[in-house]
Amino acid sequence: PKGSDGALVLVDATSAAGGLDLDTSQSDCYYFAPQKSFASDGGLWMAIMSPAAIARAEKIKVSGRWVPAFFDLSIAIENSRLDQTYNTPALATIILLAEQLNWMNKNGGLKFAASRSEDSSNRLYNWAEKTSYTTPFVTDPAMRSKVVGTINFDENIDALEIAKILRANGIVDTDPYRKLGKNQLR
């Protein structure tokens, strides 16, 4: 990429892939798991790699440096050239990913998906800012995710009870980040 002075530029897009516009010329390795925007389970890793990133993985492989097979990019590259994976992913992961990609492509591709994510996140954050008992977890609008929105609730409102009601009505995966211990939904 321009301005990288030969250094590889890697982008961890796990929470963004499929919900933000992408210019592959600006990174050497854009990698993600197909959860979030792709409506799939974790456990599968995907990457768009430049020739420079592939060459670096091959250079490491022939250097004799020990890398566990699970982390060896050259194995992933070799398998991808054979349309295979090193470990067999759950079939549901592949089906969910394929269905989501079909839906995205049918509606206009990545531009559609990014626009839809932007619109949805704007609605969520605008609602949270205007409502007396909610606030966006990330207060700086420039730093907020357009793919995963997290909303704090006033302490006298039980966010876990809201999540339970949402789940009973078919809206799933809204539970808060447990490690934060906050009264929130995402």
List PLM regions with ranges.
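Short, solvent-exposed amphipathic alpha-helical segments in soluble enzyme
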Residues: S25, I48-M49, K164-A168
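Conserved hydrophobic/aromatic beta-strand scaffold that supports enzyme active sites
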Residues: C29, L44-I48, V148-T150
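Short coil/turn connectors at secondary-structure junctions
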Residues: S4-A7, S25-S27, D41-L44, K182
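Active-site C-terminal subdomain of aminotransferase-like
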Residues: Q35-Y125
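Conserved C-terminal alpha-helix-loop-beta "cap" of PLP-dependent enzymes
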Residues: E129, Y133-R186
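Short His-Asn-centered micro-motif
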Residues: V11-A13, A33-P34, I165, T174
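Conserved active-site segment immediately N-terminal to the catalytic lysine
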Residues: L10, T24-Q35
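Catalytic PLP-binding core of fold-type I/II PLP enzymes
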Residues: P1-T24
